[in-house]
Structures are given as structure tokens and as C-alpha cells.
Amino acid sequence: MNYPWLDTYCLSKAGAEKDYKEEWAATRYMIRGKLFAMQGGDKEGRAILTLKLPPDQGRLLRENYPDIIPGYYMNKEHWNSVYLEGSVEDDVLQSMIDTSHRLILESLPKRMQKEILG
């Protein structure tokens, strides 16, 4: 994997929790049980990270980076997968993680957001 910082970065996000879903062979990063990132593999066994993005941002990134594809086994309008052996720059991937985390956090009730953010 080209992103050894990935696990630490995802877990540094406010309210982030991690588990492993054995049936999917995937590590999931969640906020109060709502997924914001999932690390697993595609059918060829290539490592991927799947993230939620606004549709327009996802389309633009997919047009500019061959290692970013529509979300693997996810809603392809809102989710995008990044090949972790690819060449997406660290700052681009970190921005994608930040956006995914923010979208999920903002989808939670305001009371819960306040608890998470302190």
C-alpha cells in the first residue's frame, strides 16, 4: 500500500470508530455506525479505499485520476473507490477522506454532532 498513514488518518477524524467485517474482508471506518470509509479489495484482490463524495466532485476526480473509480459494490453516484497501489497524491486522498467524514458527520442529528465535536 502506498498510504501507510491511512489507518491513523481515518481514526484521527472526530468520532471515528473502526471494525472489520469478515464477510466482506473489509476494514470499516464509521461515525456512530455510519460508514465514511471502507478499506478492502476488488475482485482481483487489488486494495481499495471507498469514500463518499458529492456526485460532481466524484465525477471530476474520476475524470482526472485513473486510480479513482465509481464505488466498488456501492452506490456509484455517491461513493468512489481509490486503488491504494495507485498514484493519487496524499493530499488529494486526505481531502477525499475529510469530505467523506464531513458528509457523514453532517448527516447525523445535531445533538449527536455536538457530542462528537465536543
Language model region names:
Residues 1-118:
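Charge-dense, helix-prone N-terminal extensions
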